Amino acid sequence: MGKNRKSKRQLIRDEKRAKKRGHENAEEEVRDAKRQRRTDGDEEHNADFIPLDGGNGDIPGFVIDTVGDKRRAHKYEGGEVEAEINGHGGDGGGGGGPGSFEREFFGMLAEEEQEYFRHADELLELNDFPSEEEKTIFLANVYKEAKGKELKLASSQSCSRLMERLILLSNTKQKKSMFDAFSGHFISLVTHRFASHCCEKLFLQSAPVVTQELAGEVPEEVPVEGQEEEELTENQKMSMEDLFLLTLDEFEEHLSFLLSDRYGSHALRVLLLVLAGRPLNQAGVKSLLQGKSKEYVTVEGAAANASELISQTRTVPSSFTAAIQKIIVDSTANLDGAALRVLAKHPTGNPTLQLLLDLELSMAPKGKKKAKKGEEEERQEEPVKETLLEKLVPGAPASFAEETSPACEFVNSMVYDPIGSRLLETLITHCPGKVFKGLHAHIFGPRIQSFLRNDIASYPAIKVLNRLSKEDLADAVEKSLPEFGALLEKGRLNVVRTYFERCHVRNATAQLDQLLQALTKACNNNWKHIVPKLCPLEEENEEDKSKEKKFQPAEVKNKTALLSHGCQIVSTLLSIPGNPAKAMQTSLLALPADKILRMATLNAHTAGIVTKALSTPPQLPHFHKLFVAAMLPNIIDMALTHHGNPIVCSIITMASKGDKDVPVVPFHLKENVMAKLEQRESQLRESWLGRNVWRSWKGDLWSNRRHDWVRWAKETNPEELRLAAAAGGAKTLEKQEEALKKRTEALQEEAFPEEMEEDQPEESEPVKVKKEKKEKKEKKEKKEKKEKKEKKEKKEKKEKKEKKEKKEKKEKKEKKEKKEKKPKVEEDAMEIDG
């Protein structure tokens, strides 16, 4: 399995050959396009028409997010794979390759039209309009000029961006007009290098309209002054749901071909996500929908409501669910196990297959529900269709027990493949519990430690760890403990992080202690060395700083990825109470001041550790006090950096007093930080970051009204402590003011006794008013105190009286009972005598 892989030299040679074949194919396409132009009678050369599959694009749908992903994102381009996949397309599925349908050429724009639309695109990009009214009128004119030229604009290299911006700014009526213009030509558009982006944008922006129409919340469109109302076509009168279904009808015959088409596969993925009602702008979804080098076209003034709906899970009609099921069945109907295996290793087909499998498994009914008799009869009459999961792993979970079964061979062939392993990750994450148990019991469970060592197989193995029970997880930890040091040396830090996270989630405390012990052993048996080991904070050379990030060598990128994963482990351990957090806090306090400065300012990942440490409960006495004190010498340098700035701002928001479980920074330490900031006030005011820190710490209040700053800074304390301190502080302040006033009056009387008696100046009106108010307030307070005292005394008297009455009643009752008992005793005695 892993030993039969090609060497690095062979892979590079294959890649060069594939690129050469790609260039040759591109040149042939250019020649064919030129011949086509000559036959159409159009002899002038124009850069607007670019042949399909031209240029050197990237591999869509993949993101290098880990250390081992460099090998996983290897480019498997070549005619052999394409031919093998397209050879299984069938007659009606468009599987015969690009020639299975006739590509349309929509013509080219005239030079004047090109110039006009390019200028319009520049204006919209710059948003350089004096007012909104002028922008609205300008847009109306652009729409008017583009009427009837939508297909030419979409397939033009220089004007397709304008079409995308127009779609972003379109209202519901205009979007339906776009669907009407593209109708009947969608298959040619989605397989075109530039027009495919316009189709994707149209699908994405029209998705919220379906939800709005279902809820009856379609906003009314304000007509533009001077614009003539046009007659609506049949397509424009339809609902957005029907327009999407009509588009699917055009795709139906070519689904197998679109699975692996360089541009069409992206449009198919977008359409599937729209039909499923899933969020369309999440990080994971973006990597699935577009390649790394794809330009993201935006424009100011696009509808904010639509973007909110795109970011949420949307309500979709039942017809969309049925359409997804039909797409899954039709696209894979003519693909057998061998073809699916080839498609799973194809760089363009794999992401589409991932999405189809994900949708199928998420839409599958969960739990056993009793069906009615009529439904059971209908199901028996209908032929049972084989699902995509059954095609990939036939006979699962029972077939996993046999090493020679197709299901077992499929998993073993995918687990070490840089592209196929991604499909295996999707299968492991979403497959039913029975299938997962069989997969773990027969394939991953016995060899989990060897899978976790490998840079490619570790990713499916991590997905397995995420689904394990507490007992199975403990077994996996026991198998991996002897090789824990090797995992750290090989850079499998994501495996280490997953182990700690899952043990914490499953409450496996014994395994957590074992993992921490193994980590400590790998770091010279000392907690102080853990953070430096996981996050090597080496100083950069001046030459390295001068180089641009785009041209970083592979080794530098690898170090950055390792640092990122190391920071994630430290953050994870800080969030686990007990010994893990205690070990990290011990290691952080052992760092010198310059290392803490570098950690706080290097990048977002290292700064995240400092932020996490300041927000987690202390496991060591006075941890936050000592940690902030270590930052104090370099607090200005931290304040003036992008990543350190939020850390300095967060210190003032921390409590000055509190319980043991609350992060506390003593007030005197905050005063020391503020004093440091005041010394470099002029330097802080020179930059935006410095001004932000000065505002957050209320530096002007510190300079002008220190008492108010102290009161404000202590507002971060817990409410009970703050109220108690405020009450005590107010009394102390009143006493101090009274003592000062008496002392001043006594000194004045001693110095000028006659003047004080004879020539005492009259008080001004405001002073008199204040004095009267104060006297009234004091009288009122005295009166209230007196009333409270009287009420209290009355209440006490009443309670005493009630107690006395109760006591008397009790005594009377007891006497009465004694009297009643005496005659009874005498009667009993007489009866006994008789």
UniProtKB/Swiss-Prot annotation:
Biological process, per Gene Ontology: endonucleolytic cleavage in 5'-ETS of tricistronic rRNA transcript (SSU-rRNA, 5.8S rRNA, LSU-rRNA); endonucleolytic cleavage in ITS1 to separate SSU-rRNA from 5.8S rRNA and LSU-rRNA from tricistronic rRNA transcript (SSU-rRNA, 5.8S rRNA, LSU-rRNA); endonucleolytic cleavage to generate mature 5'-end of SSU-rRNA from (SSU-rRNA, 5.8S rRNA, LSU-rRNA); ribosomal small subunit export from nucleus
Record field: compositional bias (Acidic residues): 749-764
Stretches with biased composition (Basic and acidic residues): 38-47
MF (Gene Ontology): RNA binding
GO CC annotation: 90S preribosome; nucleolus; preribosome, small subunit precursor
Pfam families xrefs: PUF_NOP9
Residue span of region Disordered: 1-54, 749-834
Main subcellular localisation: nucleus
Segments of skewed composition (Basic residues): 1-10, 770-822
Signal peptide: none
Similarity section: Belongs to the NOP9 family.
PANTHER family (alphabetical): NUCLEOLAR PROTEIN 9
Name of the protein in its database record: Nucleolar protein 9
Naturally occurring in which organism (per UniProt): Podospora anserina (strain S / ATCC MYA-4624 / DSM 980 / FGSC 10383)
Underlying gene: NOP9
